[in-house]
Curated annotation (Swiss-Prot):
Protein name according to UniProt: Large ribosomal subunit protein bL9
Biological source species: Pseudothermotoga lettingae (strain ATCC BAA-301 / DSM 14385 / NBRC 107922 / TMO) (Thermotoga lettingae)
PROSITE patterns cross-referenced by the UniProt entry: RIBOSOMAL_L9 (PS00651)
Domain of life, source organism: Bacteria
UniProt record, GO biological process: translation
Keywords: Ribonucleoprotein, Ribosomal protein, RNA-binding, rRNA-binding
Keyword RNA-binding listed: yes
An example molecular function term from Gene Ontology annotations: structural constituent of ribosome
């Protein structure tokens, strides 16, 4: 029996795939649990349309992410911070702080999840920060922590 999968099923296929399975498996397991539907003409057309829309949406997300990354890579982002002796910061620069600063400077909303930092930055200097944006877009931006001497 041909079925269209409504959810990812290990060993069988992914959502939207059309698969040939045994009649009993489809009638007694997949269909009653809402994991698959019988592959009728209408269902096949609906799945194709959903796949096209999903691919189009993913393309738009990727293009938007690439534009955001290009905007961020155009400059070195200076981050003022209060420092003590030896260039050590009072506190630390985290991905949350950095996302707020980048959002303010670039005019584009930057999610803290896009910033890949192993640990918070605690010293002044120039850093390469890895960005992981939606759509599989990756790149690095330059961030310079500039000290404001406490007087």
């Amino acid at each position: 029996m041909k079925v269209v999968l409504l959810k990812d099923i290990p060993g069988i296929g992914k959502t939207g795939d059309m698969k040939e399975v045994k009649d009993g498996y489809a009638r007694n397991f997949l269909i009653p649990r809402g994991l698959a539907k019988m592959a009728t003409e209408g269902e096949i057309k609906r799945i194709r349309n959903e796949k096209i829309l999903k691919e189009h949406k993913e393309d738009l997300t990727k293009k938007k992410s690439e534009e955001i990354l290009k905007t961020l890579q155009k400059q070195i982002h200076k981050v003022p911070a209060k420092v003590g002796g030896g260039g050590k910061l009072f506190g630390a620069l985290t991905s949350t702080n950095l996302s707020e600063i980048l959002s303010k400077n670039s005019g584009v909303e930057i999610d803290k999840k896009w910033i890949n930092m192993d640990k918070p930055l605690k010293e002044t200097g120039l850093y390469d920060i890895e960005m992981r944006l939606p759509g599989g877009v990756r790149g690095t931006i330059k961030v310079e922590i500039v000290g404001e001497e406490k007087g």
